[in-house]
């Protein structure tokens, strides 16, 4: 405190889990109302030891990218599958193929995740669906990786749908950018934490986390 010549503002960010809180505060004039040169953020991590501190230079949390895949096929009676195109079969092939993006299309040194979280149809017990909607969540720790995931996803959906003679579309939207720590400020925060907690309680090079914060 005695060596600090400045002002500290405490920012309590709303809606960080939905990745809109910081954007809203900035749009409402946070940095025009207050003369802020640097921002340091803290987040609890349940699997870290109580009283410990971790950070890293560069990317520390991933971008969050929500996607929606729609398949428009030709439904029909379950007893007459040859009279239509089973959208579930098409969607299932897409869901499995999407997992090859991370395992076969990304550099193994890169971090990425593709998860299908919903698979919705308009079928019934004895009716093959004509429409399938899949939604999901993709994470990446670089812009290049994110763009690769998006382009490969589109190629997979269009290719499989074309093979079955149906229409498919992808809506891929980045809802939260990745968090990238500045080098100098990260060093300052780590040194301060070591003074407070001790070197054995501080890790200045933790593994990046693929959850997302804004």
Predicted regions and their residues:
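Histidine/acidic-residue-rich, glycine-tolerant segments that coordinate divalent metal ions
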Residues: 2-118, 123-127, 212-213
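Metal-dependent amide/peptide-bond hydrolase catalytic core
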Residues: 89-214
